[in-house]
């Protein structure tokens, strides 16, 4: 399972509830992109969430 190395976001699990309150397991996946960034001064291809890219928390290499 992929995980954002900047914010730590990953797939989370829970229940989908119907009007009659029946429950079915489901998952919410973050929008992860594989990008090249500088890690310790060297370019590396890692998983980063679109939220981290848009907010400017990471710079592309």
From Swiss-Prot:
Keyword annotations of the record: Ribonucleoprotein, Ribosomal protein
GO cellular component, one term: ribosome
Example of a GO MF term: structural constituent of ribosome
Key word Ribonucleoprotein present: yes
Key word Transmembrane present: no
Family matches, as Pfam families: Ribosomal_L28
InterPro entries assigned: Bacterial_rp_bL28 (IPR050096), Ribosomal_bL28 (IPR026569), Ribosomal_bL28/bL31-like_sf (IPR034704), Ribosomal_bL28_bact-type (IPR001383), Ribosomal_bL28_sf (IPR037147)
Domain of life per record: Bacteria
GO BP annotation list: translation
Similarity comment: Belongs to the bacterial ribosomal protein bL28 family.
Descriptive protein name: Large ribosomal subunit protein bL28
Name of the gene: rpmB
